[in-house]
């Protein structure tokens, strides 16, 4: 712990904690904060001016990052017959129906994303209590309940990021790796922020994005200029 605290203190000296950075400058700065032996994830944290306790202020959706996430994603699909074949041909790692649900009931969930066709959501409901807490429950809002399983598999494999505001109004997401180029990170962050702005609830009042910051897996955070983010449409 002492080593980690010392490293964070050293990295913090590279950041002006009183400054809100333009996105371009923030990306330059976080690239200097790399300290781990692995390829750290670039993470964004947003504080939104919403109260998700009210259904009309929920912010939830998905977006495909243009440069991907840098992470290999294992995709499972619950489908039958032609749709099962479609999923396999699209590159799904696991495809099944009753058999896959049985594996989930046993706790065997060797996948990062679960997609299902609408007609089989009754079957998926049997394992909702297992999938829900892990954030794996298929949902139409994230494009994971669909008859177009091929497109859903492609999106998941291409770097789709799902987002959902928590009870405090926060959204966190990994938007690539520190090894990505500045341009790739810019494209990913701006695409993600545009999606957040697009999902602004009509009931949201005042300044929609209150605070924002970028960080690496093992680094302190760099504050972002919120007005620049609000202008991303």
Swiss-Prot record:
Q: Which HAMAP family match?
A: Ribosomal_uL1_B
Q: Which family does the entry's similarity section mention?
A: Belongs to the universal ribosomal protein uL1 family.
Task: List the keywords (alphabetical).
Answer: Repressor, Ribonucleoprotein, Ribosomal protein, RNA-binding, rRNA-binding, Translation regulation, tRNA-binding
Q: Which organism is it from?
A: Campylobacter jejuni subsp. jejuni serotype O:2 (strain ATCC 700819 / NCTC 11168)
Choose one Gene Ontology CC annotation of this protein and give it.
Answer: cytosolic large ribosomal subunit
Q: What is this protein called?
A: Large ribosomal subunit protein uL1
Q: Which is an annotated Pfam family here?
A: Ribosomal_L1
The record's subunit annotation is: Part of the 50S ribosomal subunit.
């Amino acid at each position: 712990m002492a080593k980690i605290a010392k490293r964070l203190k050293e990295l913090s000296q590279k950041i002006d904690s009183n400054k809100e950075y333009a996105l371009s400058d923030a990306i330059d700065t976080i690239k200097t904060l790399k300290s781990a032996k692995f390829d750290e994830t670039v993470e964004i944290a947003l504080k939104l001016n919403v109260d998700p306790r009210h259904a009309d202020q929920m912010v939830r959706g998905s977006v495909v990052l243009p440069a991907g996430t840098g992470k290999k994603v294992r995709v499972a699909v619950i489908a039958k017959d032609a749709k099962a074949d479609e999923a396999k041909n699209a590159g799904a790692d696991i495809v099944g129906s009753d058999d896959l649900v049985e594996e989930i009931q046993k706790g065997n969930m060797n996948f990062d994303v679960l997609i299902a066709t609408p007609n089989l959501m009754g079957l998926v409901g049997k394992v909702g209590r297992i999938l829900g807490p892990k954030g794996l429950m298929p949902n139409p809002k994230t494009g994971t309940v669909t008859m177009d399983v091929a497109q859903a598999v492609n999106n998941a494999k291409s770097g789709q990021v799902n987002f959902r505001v928590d009870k405090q109004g926060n959204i966190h997401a990994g938007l690539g790796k520190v090894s990505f180029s500045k341009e790739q990170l810019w494209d990913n962050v701006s695409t993600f922020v545009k999606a957040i702005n697009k999902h602004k609830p009509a009931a949201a009042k005042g300044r929609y994005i209150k605070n924002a910051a970028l960080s690496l897996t093992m680094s302190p955070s760099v504050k972002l200029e919120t007005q620049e983010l609000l202008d991303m449409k």
